[in-house]
Amino acid sequence: MSSPEPITQREKKGNPSVAYVVTCDARLHYPDMALISALSVRESDPGACIQVVLDRESARTLRKMAHPLLEVCDHTLDVETPQGAEIFRNRWLKTQLPEWISGDVLYLDADTFVRRPVLPVFAHVSGFGAVANHNGKTLEEQVWSEDRRNELEMQWDAQYHTYVNGGVWCYRNSEPVRRLFAIWHDGWKKSVLTTGRLRDQPSLNRALYESGADVTVLPGAYNVQAGFIWQGMPDAVVWHFYENPVHLNNAFARLTAMARTADPGKLRRMVARVAKLSAPWSNPDMLASLLDRMQASGGAGSVYAREWLQGQRRHMLRHLLRGR
């Protein structure tokens, strides 16, 4: 399979790229999430060059329907991939990113939301940079049981000191980094064949250890992994969600649900509003900024404000009527 010509940074030469790898099925959930994430980058880093790598099947789908993600990004690249499910195609492209985009790159998973300027992250990095998985302080906190199972089945014994998350990372393009990606892609393919699972984090961490590339563990603020416990949210540069298209339990999910139906101007204003909140509240309406400050104050109205922001309007009204 021949490789396409890499995307170059023609319009914003010299700046690092912000990159997404987007694949989709009929639900279009991942392109919708990537749209919200890219709009947040437009707010945080207006000069960023946003580039999206697509497999051919997804590219045809998104172009046929004129998905707004294609308008928000600066460049897209369609790459022929082996046949497979959307996650397989995504990982196949992601683990070879320097093949598709030249220069220095910040990669973001689709389920991320950037709140503050993120490109200054490159001041920390000379090779490859990523944040500890789960924002954990110890390996026991960082390595998920499924990832450990994957490593055991592959008989990998990587002597890493930190196990990083594969959803937000950056690199300065160099020969050691390209070797890192070659090891990552090869390890991921072998892992898929051996285990039948598409997890890419075990092979990434193995590659970081084996490649000899300079690896920086970045400050946790560059990838605050939300999960179900919102810790470190106010100080985050990037919120990273484990998104479920069914459960609209935070602002990012609500924005995603309206990504293709909302007026573009209204959607941008909502993205800008959410970026200023201390947490991704599930009810980011026009009152959100005021109520966010109120709940943070710890004053008499803070409980009511928090309930409203969490979408618990009936609870709030009931508590008000009871004189709580």
Task: Name each model feature, range by range.
Residues 2-324:
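Glycosyltransferase catalytic domains, chiefly GT-A lineage
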